[in-house]
Amino acid sequence: MKKQSKGVPTNRDIRWDRLDNTAHLFPVIAGESMSNVYRISVTLKEEINPELLQRALDMVLPKFDGFNLRLRQGVFWYYFEENGKAAPKVRMENNFPCRYIQQNKNRSYMFRVTYYKCRINLEVFHVLTDGMGGINFLKELTYQYLRLAHKDLQEKLGDSLSVDTSLNREDSFLKNYKKSSAKGYQTKKAYLIRGEKLRPGEFGVMHGYMKIPELKRVCHAMGISINEYLVSVYIWSVYTECLHGMPSKCPIRVAVPVNLRPYFNSITTKNFFVMVSAEFHPTKARSTGKILKSCFPITFPMKNC
């Protein structure tokens, strides 16, 4: 008779869960050339202690059912199954970000935690959750790490979860689904940015830094959100650098993920977002303001341009 490993659930009590509506796509299309892995980082004022970060992960992971999972393939659909193995090993960052996660080399988990100097990185396979779910996990991981690193915080805060951490696993897509008549739509082929093709697993990263108060001041003056402004600046950059401000038959299109939780009063840690296209048709010389009007005609108040 096989001895059951300590900490690994038996067949009778293994927890399983369905993938949410969006997650079904990711296991099918994911691979070395399209990892569907995103990264969220937090930078502290002190260098990271890897041993304490590992301890923090060991503490946090069992409390998050949505991360303590592995992916299984059924007859028709993929599904989640409780993992139960020790947490993945925290490693110093020494490779490209957002690489494809090979579960058989990661204790069957679909996320990784790395560090570099003062920065903690959380990389997540999108099948688990979206960016808000990742932020929820990283905030708790950082919270527990700081408790371990600073004894005065241990005494003040205790070892429970922070107040605003959510463990909700509701499928908000199903809860808020309303049947409607299907409407067809047509889109033009978008402008394709060309450049150096990297090998599978390699990613080019550009870092941009700006002062938040100044960014907020500009957005407030124009009556728009930070997201709307940054998307429009990105489109304007493509328009000026790639098209050199000239007209094009193909529109510049940016797919923007929109968090649906505020609109449906949801705190789920599963995926709950929708992709919205911001589109600009370059027909003549335009300013950033004109691009804003073109991409966000409903929210942009048509002033200060």
Which positions does each model-derived feature cover?
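Acyl-thioester-dependent acyl-group transfer interface
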Residues: 1-76, 85-112, 121, 207-210, ...
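Helix N-cap motif at beta-to-alpha junctions
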Residues: 47, 127-128
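Alpha-helical hinge/cap motifs
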Residues: 126, 219-227
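Short amphipathic alpha-helical segments
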Residues: 226-235
